[in-house]
């Protein structure tokens, strides 16, 4: 039997973007209950930088640290099913899908995974948006759920111009909250367009928020770090309604929440998000796109933590 090969991102040691390589790997045929997908687009996420630099080894150890070979990269993708394993119902070769990989292997021309890790891609959702939806979307949903947003609440979303922040802001607005969104000035017009009240981050943030919402803040979502948890505490937010996805020292110091994507049902949440995007109730801007062989440049841009929306790898041609 002929073995097919395709390109994939791999790294064999911890470090900066220089450790990332695009290499040829054997395509694994789908086993029972699995599908193989040709990846069209794959998202880039900040947390992947922390994993690749070794900062998360105690939580998500790499394959190479266990002596199991190189590590893959990425969880988000969208593509076209090219093979279907035995005992798989509801999907067929040629179906356009949005998916998620449990094994950080999505940044590749081909990915094989359980069939329940893909959902239909709505026709109205672009490949770039579909390919960068899973991590940001499920994390945003988890953040909003963690702080128990109720209709009429005032909520601050810190770091609102990133993928998680943009989606958390919109989910909170859809839930009936008034959202104060922190971001640099160049992103304020966009945040206003999605229903938020923008405020510039940095020194004096607490005073600026108090002037905007003198009656106080009910909940606070931190997607950026850099003192936002302390700001939430100074604003008098109930610590059980403060959630950070990045500032673990502050989480421990102040006793706030630290809930992320692992706390929501992945497939069901992805279906909900795709429906909201297709209906026009959510938008997800794309900051930049790169071909697979420029993955290092893509992560270098991500590491600057500036810009509006998602960075995406365009892996193979769209149908």
Model-derived regions: residue spans:
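A structural motif shared across PLP-dependent enzymes of the aminotransferase-like
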Residues: 101-115
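C-terminal hydrophobic helical "lid"/dimerization subdomain
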Residues: 2-4, 270-319
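Glycine-rich cofactor phosphate-binding loops and adjacent beta1-alpha1 units
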Residues: 180, 194-260
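N-terminal glycine-rich beta->alpha transition that marks the start or flank
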Residues: 2-4, 16-19, 25-78
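A glycine-/small-residue-rich N-terminal strand-loop-strand element
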Residues: 77-102
């Amino acid at each position: 039997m002929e073995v097919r090969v395709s390109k994939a991102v791999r790294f064999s040691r911890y470090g900066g973007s220089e450790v990332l390589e695009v290499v040829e790997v054997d395509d694994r045929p789908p086993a029972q209950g699995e599908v193989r997908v040709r990846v069209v687009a794959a998202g880039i996420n900040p947390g992947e930088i922390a994993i690749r630099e070794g900062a998360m080894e105690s939580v998500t150890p790499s394959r190479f640290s266990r002596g199991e070979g190189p590590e893959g990269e990425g969880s988000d993708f969208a593509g076209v099913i090219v093979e279907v394993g035995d005992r798989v119902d509801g999907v067929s070769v040629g179906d356009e899908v949005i998916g998620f990989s449990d094994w950080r292997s999505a940044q590749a021309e081909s990915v094989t995974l359980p069939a329940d890790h893909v959902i239909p891609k709505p026709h109205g959702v672009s490949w770039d948006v579909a390919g960068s939806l899973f991590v940001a979307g499920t994390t945003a949903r988890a953040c909003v759920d963690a702080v128990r947003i109720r209709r009429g609440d005032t909520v601050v979303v810190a770091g609102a111009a990133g993928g998680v922040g943009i989606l958390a802001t919109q989910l909170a607005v859809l839930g009936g909250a008034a959202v104060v969104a922190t971001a640099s000035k160049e992103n304020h017009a966009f945040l206003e367009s999605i229903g938020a009240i923008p405020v510039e981050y940095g020194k004096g943030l607490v005073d600026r928020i108090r002037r905007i919402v003198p009656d106080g803040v009910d909940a606070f979502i931190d997607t950026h770090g850099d003192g936002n948890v302390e700001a939430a505490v100074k604003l008098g937010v109930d610590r059980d309604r403060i959630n950070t996805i990045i500032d673990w020292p502050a989480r421990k110091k102040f006793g706030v929440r630290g809930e992320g994507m692992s706390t929501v049902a992945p497939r069901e949440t992805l279906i909900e998000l795709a429906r909201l995007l297709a209906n026009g109730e959510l938008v997800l801007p794309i900051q930049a796109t790169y071909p697979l062989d420029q993955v290092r440049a893509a992560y270098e841009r991500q590491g600057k933590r500036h810009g509006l929306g998602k960075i995406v790898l365009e892996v193979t041609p769209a149908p």
